[in-house]
């Protein structure tokens, strides 16, 4: 048991999906998993364990932002021995060729957060995905015909940015899109020597201004979820 996860020892699988939205966690459990047990409801942040294609897997909501992701990733690793963490979330696209509903595999994460400037004493740490998860996820996505886009993304501490042109700098340097958690996930995974990966579905677009609905973000984007789960099965 940890401060924010009220689960007994052994209740959480070694491989876990991490949606930000706890209702998406419930949707994944209800849609894809068998023999499901809810192990956490603390703060309304649902966690479930079940089986997918015969393999034990968990799914845990993390909330929004780097601090919240940091809490859940740390507790899952330290208190429950989780070894493989795959974030399944949404992002805004920075580049025209990456369309709404496209699948992004985040190879690395830039950030405006101070999460790494403090422990690294002002020096820059480059948070990157685990190749042991990235490679099979990419292969599985291609096999399924999803045409994944692989590259860097931007993890921002600011959702409502007063600088409406700032995103263009990140796009110029190759960032495919923006979300709010991956830099923390990759950093914490590196700290503890475990595997982490982020899969993102594009929910809105900075260039075309196309958006998806809140309901669609919560209950669809199944391609991303299938790729994440099949990656775990193939570990």
Curated annotation (Swiss-Prot):
Phosphate binds at residues 20, 24, 43, 87-90. Its EC number is 2.4.2.1. The active site is at 204 (proton donor). It catalyses: a purine D-ribonucleoside + phosphate = a purine nucleobase + alpha-D-ribose 1-phosphate; a purine 2'-deoxy-D-ribonucleoside + phosphate = a purine nucleobase + 2-deoxy-alpha-D-ribose 1-phosphate. It holds the Pfam family PNP_UDP_1. A purine D-ribonucleoside binds at residues 4, 179-181, 203-204. It is an enzyme of class 2 (transferase). The keyword Glycosyltransferase applies. GO terms for molecular function: purine-nucleoside phosphorylase activity. This is Purine nucleoside phosphorylase DeoD-type.
